[in-house]
């Protein structure tokens, strides 16, 4: 191991970086396929372009050196961050330059957000609708305006500065990626130092990140939003640097500011309860969470993460060792427990990525549900289009990330799993019990599928025969979700009890309580549950379990199975076990991801359908003269969604009227997308239903015709491989299906307002 030259600071210890390890060459980097000896020769056949895409980021195929792979991944992270900063900059620039943000700030109930104006080239300006006060543009549903208001941005200069700042950050990140690969590249030991990594992530990123955001919320967001809520015009509100250190200005809004830091140092922290609160529920002015609750929440997280970050043994020889924690973690039925997993997670980035993807995918789904039950930003709750979009967006992200977790778990099993390291630990025992696990999971899927779908089939039969008294419904044979109702009641009444003694209210109105109206629209209310909810819940359970069955089977059988004992030698993706063995196709780890994605699509689609209809029926609506609510679909969920016919008639057909009739209106783009995405989806079936041989024969006859005309191409055309065909089919299937449903949702909710 080499040490860095010179300087007393490195004396006696090894350097953590290599200086100038890889020369930077635009000539090399600009050559397609430079990372692969075969690809770098250029295309001989059309297969080259497919292999180029498949292998460009598959660093394992480019080198066996774990340090080099680690450096490439680390460098790529900075490139990824750079792209994110450019994306953020673009959104904020649009808000500053092309939007009605300032009009929306002044009257968020009378204006719809728009940050996109379509140019009138051949009539596309029909897409620009009047979103309020005469501003014509495309209504956006990203939540951009709500988060900018929540952050306290009221001045064009702030938005332009943020947009430019994000571009500067993008350049810095891009340079950092270059610097940490070509100039000073970390050594493998640096990447494998789990304790220092945890300390840095917990204290610096999460702890100080939360603390910094708490500071912003208290010193910028709270005063600006309080002034906006009290009716002060945005242009009359001073920009942050004008009041940041003006305690008199702040004390007028939050009196405890007059006391400065004295309450903090005298442990009289309760004095700050005017801006660090525990109110619960939603602010009746904006329909969002109380900004003071949000500040309190982030302060608590900051304290927790900073304390947690001091847990691990780094420079001073005190604290926990990650390896020791794992090796001492044994249960009565887990053999050697987590022994060996430290080695797994420090030598296989696929294993670590699998855990992170599954975790963050689950977080994304949790975020989707929190965004409507506890809308964090001002006036988000009554912007139904944005509410819907944020739910659908985070559900799809969650689904894809979880499947990605299974993909990298299978890659880990094929490429990185070492049986010698995993002896009788939890991973080894999972593999030894895989037949039991899969057969039980299969039984659960069969049970859930027949019983949950059977309830719907029963109801369709009874309704078709004119026997409503024999249906499963709230008015006949009831299947009430009593446990869910119990949890709702428990949470609705939690404030002031021993479980939440300091809370002034429940965390969400979804648990119970009267509707909260903002501008005459329901921001949130009690989400009542009944037989229809019990039934669709079990459909969700069925689809989740089938998706998990496919993914878990792919992971547990990635290395071997009774059918193909030497599967590990065939790699992560292979079409079949050679030409001599029939019936071995679609058994690779890759194929399980391929199949799992279809079921993930089914699963998330029904979740989104459920959410969209349920909210229209039982939550979203306008206040009527009697103090009640006129719901968008008049509460038809409970009786219509309990039959398959009801789903087809009252949801898919009845609610697609807006997108089907959108031509000639500002929503016509959604009609075009709806039609085009159906075509893309149908086009996918051509790839999924036909085999490679058909296309190769067709190509050869076409090449023959070109040769006769002496216009044969230099690059030999070749049909896609079986795996490539499946990938292209899957991509079109998912793209077509998701865009079809997305355009349907948006056209309807924007038309209803």
Swiss-Prot record:
Pfam families recorded: PsaA_PsaB
Ligand binding (chlorophyll a'): 678
Topological category with respect to the lipid bilayer: Multi-pass membrane protein
EC category: oxidoreductase
Matches recorded under Gene3D superfamilies: Photosystem I PsaA/PsaB
Domain of life: Bacteria
Membrane-spanning segments: 73-96, 159-182, 198-222, 294-312, 349-372, 388-414, 436-458, 534-552, 592-613, 667-689, 727-747
Alphabetized UniProt keyword annotations: 4Fe-4S, Chlorophyll, Chromophore, Electron transport, Iron, Iron-sulfur, Magnesium, Membrane, Metal-binding, Oxidoreductase, Photosynthesis, Photosystem I, Thylakoid, Transmembrane, Transmembrane helix, Transport
CC cofactor note: PSI electron transfer chain: 5 chlorophyll a, 1 chlorophyll a', 2 phylloquinones and 3 4Fe-4S clusters. PSI core antenna: 90 chlorophyll a, 22 carotenoids, 3 phospholipids and 1 galactolipid. P700 is a chlorophyll a/chlorophyll a' dimer, A0 is one or more chlorophyll a, A1 is one or both phylloquinones and FX is a shared 4Fe-4S iron-sulfur center.
KW DNA damage (keyword) present: no
The keyword Transcription is assigned to this record: no
PROSITE patterns attached to this UniProt entry: PHOTOSYSTEM_I_PSAAB
Reaction(s) catalysed by this chain's protein: reduced [plastocyanin] + hnu + oxidized [2Fe-2S]-[ferredoxin] = oxidized [plastocyanin] + reduced [2Fe-2S]-[ferredoxin]
Chain positions recorded as chlorophyll a binding sites: 686, 694
Subcellular location: Cellular thylakoid membrane
EC id: 1.97.1.12
InterPro entries tied to this protein: PSI_PsaA, PSI_PsaA/B, PSI_PsaA/B_CS, PSI_PsaA/B_sf
Residues the entry annotates as binding [4Fe-4S] cluster: 576, 585
Gene Ontology MF terms in the entry: 4 iron, 4 sulfur cluster binding; chlorophyll binding; electron transfer activity; magnesium ion binding; oxidoreductase activity
Record's function text: PsaA and PsaB bind P700, the primary electron donor of photosystem I (PSI), as well as the electron acceptors A0, A1 and FX. PSI is a plastocyanin/cytochrome c6-ferredoxin oxidoreductase, converting photonic excitation into a charge separation, which transfers an electron from the donor P700 chlorophyll pair to the spectroscopically characterized acceptors A0, A1, FX, FA and FB in turn. Oxidized P700 is reduced on the lumenal side of the thylakoid membrane by plastocyanin or cytochrome c6.
Quaternary structure note: The PsaA/B heterodimer binds the P700 chlorophyll special pair and subsequent electron acceptors. PSI consists of a core antenna complex that captures photons, and an electron transfer chain that converts photonic excitation into a charge separation. The cyanobacterial PSI reaction center is composed of one copy each of PsaA,B,C,D,E,F,I,J,K,L,M and X, and forms trimeric complexes.
Family: Belongs to the PsaA/PsaB family.
Database matches in HAMAP family: PSI_PsaA
Designated name of the protein: Photosystem I P700 chlorophyll a apoprotein A1
Species per Swiss-Prot/TrEMBL record: Acaryochloris marina (strain MBIC 11017)
